[in-house]
Structure formats: C-alpha cells, structure tokens
C-alpha cells in the first residue's frame, strides 16, 4: 500500500479496533404518549431531580414509571422558536462524492467517472457536443458573477417571488493552505438546461449525477426553509418530561433539493412531529407510559461518504484522488464493503500492523498531511522537488534497509525469534524456519523439500464475536457474527444449548424470488458463491459477489461486482442484466 492508502487503511483498521474494544452500556428511556383535544404527542423524560436521567436497569425504569403514573401531567412551559435552514453551498469535489454516496449510492470512482463524462461533453441535440458541468476537481465554492446572475434569473422566472432572496447567497471557501481555488464550484455550464431536457442524451449515471449537481446549484441561490419549533415542558415535581415538535411553514430551497443523510447523523427538524396547540397550565391526558431499553453504541464504521469527509478534514490526499485511494484498498482486498460500510480484511490488518509498526514516522496522519502541503508548494514553485525528495527518501531508505521481512511476518503472527529458534522438527530434529507461500506464511523444516516434508500452518487468532440485531430462527435469542474455517456466519448466543446458525445476509433481496436475502455460501471445496437464503425453495446463485449498488437502468438495488484484466472493473444488475464499466482494464492493472 502507498503512503496515502496506508493512512486511509489505518483509519479503517483503528476504527475497527475501537469497535472491538467497545463495551455496550445499558440505559433506559421513558416516553409518555400524551393527548390534548384528541391530538396525540410524545413527551420524553428529560430530567430527574434537575439532572439528566441515569436509568441503568429495568427496575430503575419501572420505579419511575410507577411514580409518574400517579402524577398529573401539566404544561409548565411553552417555548416557540422560528428556525431557518439555509441551503448548502454548490459542490466541491469532496462534497459531490459525499452527497452522491448518500443520495445515489455511488462509489467515489463511479461519481468521478460520470462527472468526467459530463465535463468532457455530450451531444445534446441542437446544441451539439456540449460540456454540461464545470471542472469537477476543485476545492472552491466560488461561483462566477455571470453564473449567479443566470441562476437568479432562472429562479425568478420559474418560481414564486419568496423563493428568490433579495441578494445573492454567498459562500466562503475554507481558508487554509491545502485548498485549491483555481476553479470555481461544480455547477451546470448552463442552468437553463434542465435535467429532464438532456436526459435522453445521457447514460443513467450521467443523468442522475447531472440532476444532483443542477438541483444543488439552483437550490444554493434560493431562500432558506423556515420552521416553527415548539418545546413543551411538563413539570411533575421531581420529574420533567419534554416534547419537541416542528412544523415546516415555508419550504424554501426544499422545493427543489433535500440533503442526503446517514443513520448516525441524527434527527433534523424535518423528523420532528408537530405538537398540538398548548398553553401554560393545560393538563394533558396520558394514554401510555413506556420504558425502553437501549445500549450505547460503538463509533460507526466508515462509509464511503464519511471516509471521504474524514480524509478531507485531516488533509490526507486530494479530493480528486479519493476515488483511486478507496478503489485501491478494495482491489487489493485490504478492505471489504458490507452494507456500504468498510471492514478491514485479515490481510488489511496485517499490512497496517507491519507498515505502521516499522514506518511510524511515514504512515501517520500528521506526516501525510504535511507532505500534501509540500507537494502543493512544489506545484506553486515555492519548494524545490529534489530537496523535498531527498529529505524524505534519505531516512526512508535507511528504515527500509533495516527491515527484516521474515521478522515482520513473525511479529505480525505473534512469533518471537527466541521461541522460533528453540523449535525443532518433530520428524528429523532439524531447526524450524518461517516461510511464505501462496496461501500465506507457514512453518517448515529447514530441510523441507530436500530430505524432510514437515510443514505446519500458522493458526490464525479467531476474530472476536460481533453482536448483531438478528434473532435466532430456532429459539429467538440474539445472534452474533462468528468466524469459522469458511469465513463469517451468524450463530446463536445460547450455543451449545441451541445450535442455530445461518449465513450472513448481504442486505440485498434475491432477484429471482424477491423474498429472501442473498448471502455468501461455500462449496464443499471451500469456494465462495452467493445464493438465496431460501434455498432449496429458491435456487438463485452467482459466482460474482453482489454489492448494494443501485442499477441506473431499472433501479434494482443489487449488482454483481467483477474485476478482470480483460474487462476491468464492472457492475452487472442482478435483475435486468444492465452492465457498466467502473474502471477500464489499464486502470485495474495499475491500481
């Protein structure tokens, strides 16, 4: 792995270690379903004795429920707020990749390929070959005065007056040494070309990305969305319940565009239900009081969008290289993607452990970020590249010469040199050495292949069980992800009392029966294939791994991923067979 790829891999591996080390803590919440004049709303326990509730068991929660059931729920405070939600800035390379991942399910590579096509131009009928968007490799949110005048004229002609602000909306590009401001933000070259007018001339991916860019740009010059928020307190003495509601009173830029979100980003004003009209002193009916059990959750694994955001925040790589960085990690099988989240593979963890342990000065975030600044300064003519290369390569070459690859592999597998030196071949009594073959490292007699045939595989440390939300189909108990000789699988937590196991579903529906999920399975010889969990009722199977990409042709979520020297990296829809090329053969060969 290269300098930048290794740091990206390090982020993924370190996040996985955080998750493994995380210990969930139980806590409880209490919600009251209230009603006033026939309209219901929910209030949650906000304080106990003036402090945030600390309920860590069912008994503690039930004690509160029993106490508040006897008390009247009276409104003691009503606070109303007027909130405005401003539109986002036009896209930069990074924000385009993030938003396309959230809203369209596109990988960074898929986004940049479609953007490149739109920039290079398409034949759009009477206008002939035309570039549809501005340059797609930029850190700037700056927009030309002519483009702003054009989009304001478009909004004024096509939307009612309240949607056009009195003055243009302005956005500031982040001010730091890494930002490249030579090109303006990503926008349509002509805002009058509506997405539906050019759809017939575009491939499905190109159309969806153009629509995203066009809508975001037009929305960036529209008025804010306006909400009326209401916060109601119901003070029961020692216990305080609170309800928060929101009503959209003017949609503003939402008439055209709504931002994509990921699960961990939390609720917004759009998610809050309305609250009926209430005044201080009103008594409300309580229909139900419900305690709910929760567990604290570990930090989420990186998605493509959140990894791109973190790389940009840390100053690692350039936005234009993010797609190549992520693609390289996947192509070399350092990471795998499950339900659009990155998991490090065993190989990836091994590579990260070796590289970070032996080259700590090079493969850290600060060094890589500083190197990006120096490369930018070379480009600007402020630094001499030979001096920068010498300053880097001199210590690096010395560190490289000192590396003992065999010792690295041994260390990664927990083998100490002194222990290895003591081992003797059980067949001939000779010394034992560490070797590396096509299936990984192994121990062998020093006379192996000459006069002795003794070999011993290195046992891999079993990965810790990972909790899931799945329930056992036999007994209903929670299931965990375990690792066996043929990979990962779901197993009942009550084993050996219950021997319930099943394959891990990919979160992709079977395209044949439309009922079961697809899951990885193994042949008797251990070769992977993917099939429907309803087998033998459904016999669908494929040798190529399904990924949760959306088919641009039919909209089906589920495409086969295939990488070959002949065709490059492709995706083929499991439902309609539509095929698209994500990387040409030469790109795959150099990844």
Each PLM stretch: what is its role?
Residues 75-78, 87-100, 127-135, 298-310:
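Short acidic, hydrophobic short linear motifs in intrinsically disordered regions
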Residues 96, 118, 329:
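Calcium-regulated, polybasic anionic-phospholipid
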Residues 99, 103-107:
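A conserved hydrophobic secondary-structure block that centers on an alpha-helix together
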Residues 112-116, 326-327:
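Short, hydrophobic-biased segments on the C-terminal half of alpha helices
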């Amino acid at each position: 792995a290269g300098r930048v790829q290794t740091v990206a891999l390090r982020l993924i591996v370190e996040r996985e270690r955080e998750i493994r080390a995380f210990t969930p803590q139980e806590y409880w919440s209490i919600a009251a379903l209230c009603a006033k004049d026939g309209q219901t709303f929910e209030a949650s326990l906000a304080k106990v004795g003036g402090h945030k509730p600390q309920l860590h068991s069912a008994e503690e929660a039930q004690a509160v429920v029993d106490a508040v059931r006897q008390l009247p729920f009276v409104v003691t405070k009503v606070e109303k707020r007027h909130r405005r939600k401003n539109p986002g800035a036009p896209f930069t390379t990074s924000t385009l990749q993030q938003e396309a991942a959230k809203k369209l399910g596109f990988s960074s590579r898929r986004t940049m390929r479609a953007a490149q096509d739109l920039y290079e131009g398409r034949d759009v009928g009477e206008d002939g070959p035309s570039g549809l968007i501005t340059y797609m490799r930029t850190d700037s949110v700056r927009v030309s005065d002519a483009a702003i005048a054009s989009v304001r004229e478009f909004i004024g002609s096509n939307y009612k007056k309240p949607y056009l602000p009195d003055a243009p909306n302005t956005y500031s590009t982040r001010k730091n040494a890494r930002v490249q401001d030579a090109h303006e933000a990503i926008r349509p070259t002509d805002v009058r070309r509506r997405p539906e007018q050019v759809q017939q001339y575009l491939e499905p991916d190109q159309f969806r990305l153009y629509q995203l860019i066009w809508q975001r740009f037009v929305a960036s010059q529209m008025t804010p969305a306006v909400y009326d928020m209401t916060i109601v307190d119901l003070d029961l003495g020692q216990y305080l319940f609170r309800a928060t509601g929101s009503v959209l009173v003017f949609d503003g830029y939402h008439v055209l565009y709504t931002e994509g979100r990921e699960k961990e980003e939390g609720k917004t004003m759009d998610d809050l239900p309305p609250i009926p009209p209430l005044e201080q002193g009103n008594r409300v009916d309580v229909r139900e009081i419900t305690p709910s059990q929760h567990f604290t959750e570990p930090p989420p694994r990186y998605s493509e969008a959140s990894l791109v955001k973190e790389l940009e925040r840390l100053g690692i790589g350039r936005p234009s290289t993010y797609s190549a960085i992520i693609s390289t990690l996947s192509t070399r099988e350092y990471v795998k993607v499950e339900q659009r989240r990155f998991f490090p593979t065993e190989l990836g963890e091994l590579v990260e452990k070796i590289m970070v342990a032996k080259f700590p000065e090079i493969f850290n975030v600060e060094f890589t970020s500083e190197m990006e600044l120096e490369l930018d300064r070379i480009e600007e003519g402020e630094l001499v590249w030979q001096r920068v290369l010498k300053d880097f390569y001199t210590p690096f070459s010395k560190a490289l010469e000192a590396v003992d690859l065999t010792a690295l592999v041994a260390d990664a597998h927990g083998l100490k040199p002194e222990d290895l030196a003591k081992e003797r071949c059980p067949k001939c009594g000779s010394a034992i050495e560490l070797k590396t073959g096509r299936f990984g490292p192994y121990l062998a007699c020093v006379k192996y292949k000459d006069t002795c045939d003794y070999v011993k595989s290195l046992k891999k440390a079993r990965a810790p069980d990972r909790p899931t939300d799945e329930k056992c189909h036999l007994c209903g108990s929670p299931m965990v992800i375990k690792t066996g000789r043929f990979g990962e699988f779901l197993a009942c937590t009550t084993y050996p009392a219950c021997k319930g196991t099943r394959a891990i579903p990919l979160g992709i529906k079977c395209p044949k029966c439309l009922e079961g999920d697809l899951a990885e399975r193994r042949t008797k010889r251990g070769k992977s294939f993917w099939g429907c969990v309803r087998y033998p009722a459904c016999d669908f199977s494929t040798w190529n791994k399904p990924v949760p990409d959306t088919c641009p042709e039919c909209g089906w979520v589920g495409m086969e991923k295939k990488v070959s020297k002949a065709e490059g990296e492709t995706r083929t829809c499991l439902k309609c067979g539509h095929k698209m090329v994500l990387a040409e053969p030469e790109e795959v060969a150099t990844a």
